[in-house]
Amino acid sequence: MTDSESAAAVSVDAAAYREAMSRLASAVHLITTDGPGGRAGFTASAVCSVSDAPPTLLVCINRASSAYAALTQNGTLCVNTLGEGHETVASLFGGRTPVDERFAAGTWRRLRSGAPALADALVSFDCRIVGRHAVGSHDVLYCAVEAVAASGEADALLYSERRYRTLPRTPRSGSAPAEPARAPRAVGARPAEGPALALRSA
């Protein structure tokens, strides 16, 4: 048996995998879209940089997500990275809340694509979907970044062990002396119909 055949024969229990993944601390994002396919959005942590030449992000979405059809038809999205104080809006976008109620919880603006950009997000990446790859229940979306807006000054919002936590900002060089280091702190348990593992990929 080759190494590849041996690897393919190993079956990892899905529940054990989800429990292991819950221990990975991840940034929390709202993925939003608007256009011919309608307005939609979901909470995600399965977001990462692919390249800076050209600037490209990767976003994963479950094909069963209520936002999937709109994203597919619109072909654009905005990745809004959240900070402390965004726990409520993150939970709304991660559950079964109606679309209008989700967007009513924030103040929005438009960048280049027309996808809603959260006004007080730590940073918003306005993107055009340029490629996709199906893996299991999800699509991996490759997104060309066409505009960036950084406005928020809050501590970063993380999701780890099924709880929201915050990561204190590090002062930039030349700024005021740093306060003593603080450990990340928990700021709330996962809501009953909140993101769970779906937070990683909605």
Curated annotation (Swiss-Prot):
Residue ranges the record marks as coiled coil: none
GO molecular function, a single term: riboflavin reductase (NADPH) activity
Catalytic activity entry: FMNH2 + NAD(+) = FMN + NADH + 2 H(+)
Annotated GO biological process: nitrogen utilization; uracil catabolic process
Entry keywords, A to Z: Flavoprotein, FMN, NAD, Oxidoreductase
Residues covered by region (Disordered): 168-202
Keyword flag Protease: no
Pfam families: Flavin_Reduct
Superkingdom of source: Bacteria
SUPFAM superfamilies attached to this UniProt entry: FMN-binding split barrel
The EC number(s) this enzyme carries: 1.5.1.42
Low complexity bias: start-end ranges: 171-196
Family according to the record: Belongs to the non-flavoprotein flavin reductase family. RutF subfamily.
Role description: Catalyzes the reduction of FMN to FMNH2 which is used to reduce pyrimidine by RutA via the Rut pathway.
The protein, known as: FMN reductase (NADH) RutF 1
Chain's gene name: rutF1
